[in-house]
Design a protein with these regions (language model features):
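S-adenosylmethionine/decaboxylated-SAM
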Residues: 1-157
Length: 157
């Protein structure tokens, strides 16, 4: 979030930046840390774009059950803002969200997004996204790395 804000705040064109955070603690931290940069153009919202029933729930990893419980609890603390943003087109979307929500978020955002930046590509949350983008003729891999948990950037062709 900070990197995006630093890159945008000196621009004078008509842009909009929205960061969504479902976790109340992360939302509070982000809002406090970025407080000086927030404006009509730069917003951090405590919200989500999918509902509980859209979360991945069939992970075979035992440790995932605790993470899923936490994600579901976080979802109960915030509102779904999809109806407020679904008619926008996004130049860039960074998918670095929840382990169990990212696939459903990607499916909603894919038709209205030009560039996806994916963090943690080797993890559950973005593995399936990478597979879909790699197999599609509508998307081109711009950059990828296997360092840490991996990242990738895809652009609509």
């Amino acid at each position: 979030t900070t990197c995006f804000i630093q890159g945008l705040k000196n621009r004078d064109d008509d842009y909009s930046f929205i960061s969504l955070e479902a976790c109340p603690n992360f939302y509070s931290q982000a809002k406090k840390y970025c407080e000086q940069s927030l404006s009509d153009k730069i917003q951090i919202l405590h919200g989500r774009i999918i509902d509980d029933e859209e979360l991945i729930k069939d992970s075979k990893e035992p440790q995932h059950s605790d993470f899923l419980k936490t994600d579901r609890n976080n979802y109960n603390t915030c509102v779904n803002v999809w109806d407020e943003i679904k008619n926008q087109n996004f130049d860039v979307v960074l998918l670095d969200g929840g382990e169990f929500s990212t696939w459903a978020e990607f499916k909603k955002l894919q038709p209205i997004t030009m560039v996806f930046i994916l963090d943690d590509c080797k993890m559950l949350k973005n593995k399936k996204v990478v597979e879909e983008l790699n197999s599609s003729s509508q998307w081109r891999l711009v950059k990828a790395s296997n360092k840490r948990n991996g990242f990738a950037i895809y652009e609509r062709v």
